[in-house]
Amino acid sequence: MNYNEFKDYVKEHVLDYLPEQYKNANMDIRQAVKNNDVVLDGLTIFNPNGNMSPTIYLNSAYEEYQQGMDIEDVVGKIADAYIEHIEPREEYRFNFDLQEVKNYEVVKDFIYPKVSNLQSNVNRLSNIPYTQKEDLAITYHIWANGNEESMGSITINNDLMELYGVSMDTLHDQAMNNMDKISPLKFESLQETMVGMLASDFAKEEGISIDEAKDLIRGSIPNDGPDVYCLSNEARANGAVYIMREDVQQMVAEKLGGDYYVLPSSIHETLILPKSENMSFQRLQDMVQDVNAMCVSEEEVLSDGVYQYDAKSHTFSRCDRQPELTYKQAQGMTNNMEVRELVATAENKQEYDSTTPNHTHEPIKHKGH
């Protein structure tokens, strides 16, 4: 079936995979402008309790269907993702209704930042408050529900900002201060990042413990190249924003003993390399662009540049020293950037994925079905 037929099928059948209280739930499929002005189709199943309802994006679900996943499994996976976000769980830190979103005092402790590219988000940034750093934009979001690995969020737009009645500085400081408790910093060698990513699957395949798997993986990864570190958060989701914090910039400089390069691997993490005379900025930039073009999904690209931190002056800047773009300047530039780059070390995150184990999904047959 084509994409439009797929959307119709999902809308017609997804309620069969949900508990009975959802059998008469209203649904809607709307387009949403996401990071890098990527437009996705989002399915919203309105919560019968009147609380916030998550949006499950169908584009990546259709890709899995095209790759051979059974349509019933695809629809079941979408239903799992919905339940994962909507049902209160002990480990979930916050669930609230629509009216509470409008109250700054209620949501302020659950506001967190994300970072994106200014030029690639002209449309999206036209209706949301942001703070510019070099050619990057820090935006602000409310952790609506979910746990650290499955975060449902609401973007703070200009209308909400007006209702809150707080300054940009207040909003920015609140979001930055919340980062450590919402999803703490993770700074480690790239080798350890790869070990952590591969260990679980490898342990299952080989029937060994996680620690044994990690030891075997460490032994198979070459470590004779330059020192490379990964900066993200524990959830490895939208963790690149940590490099925007001045205290984190200084912490990294202290650990590495001086200046360093920052490679924008994706919106989820950055790679850090200590500066050396043998390291060519142009070579790094070429690598960033090539890997981004081949490995990073369009929605997860952060930047086409390489950045640097000067430990003496405590300054973070883009290496080619382009003047900072204002939003109006960015509006006048094409969004067809040369080559979408970046070094991605984390797996692409599919927004409709649930954290439940994969299994064969059978529809829940409600009365009258």
Language model regions located:
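A glycine-rich phosphate-binding loop feature that marks nucleotide/adenosyl-phosphate handling sites
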Residues: 31-35, 267-270, 306-312
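Short glycine-/aliphatic-rich beta-strand segments at the starts of folded cytosolic domains
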Residues: 226-240
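Short amphipathic alpha-helix segments
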Residues: 240-254
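Non-Sec secretion/translocation targeting segments of pathogen effectors
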Residues: 329-369
